[in-house]
Amino acid sequence: MLSEHKKHRTKYHSHGQMSESFLTAVFLSLSGGLQDAYTYVYRGKVFANAQTGNIVLLSQNIYEQNWTTALHYFVPLLSFVLGVAIAEWIRQSFQTWQAIHWRQIVLLSEILLLFAVGFLPEDLNMLANAVVSFSCAMQVQAFRKMTGYAFASTMCIGNMRSGMEALFLYLRTHDRGTLKKSLCYWKIIFLFGFGAGIGGHFVYVFGAKTIWFSCALLLVGFFLMFIKEEIEEHEEMHEQLQGIAGK
């Protein structure tokens, strides 16, 4: 009965996009973790990806009337929302292109922007953080599915919730599908942390140019997306999309 239920909840597409594959998610998550460590450790303790910390610090400094410091956290927030808008514009404008997927355009734009960040000196940290936040927002808006499940490649809270939920369900039902789902999320979380660890170490060796390693990881994802593969799409993914990717 469980297998019959599972059959109804899973759809297979023979011409899937590698942008939704686990392999692509690996490189995006490594890059996402590296970006966050880069801006926090090297660019003035600003979170480029998860904006919750920036909102907290912005609010605190506004309350204390530290306007210069408040601006320090407001700029990446503004850049993030603009990045989401631009990614959506790219999707609507280039979704019907056949030669290249619109998500590849997002990745290529992100690579070029992050490459430029590597040339910015430390006295331009505010600009560097703005560009990284903008790029991150494009990525999180464009890549919201992994093997048919909703996920985020630049932050962990939604992935942790979904991974734990699936693990709890597996312990109750012993359904291997939910175990596979949970493991996918925990692997992505580990890879994000691994990327952050690499980024945090590399800044002491490569300085501003550490962000170029993120570019290299994204470039792998860019070329992977020329491949087509069969993917699964799960009905619960549609429910998750509303919550996970936006957290």
Label each residue range with its predicted role:
Residues 2-247:
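Alpha-helical transmembrane segments of multi-pass membrane proteins
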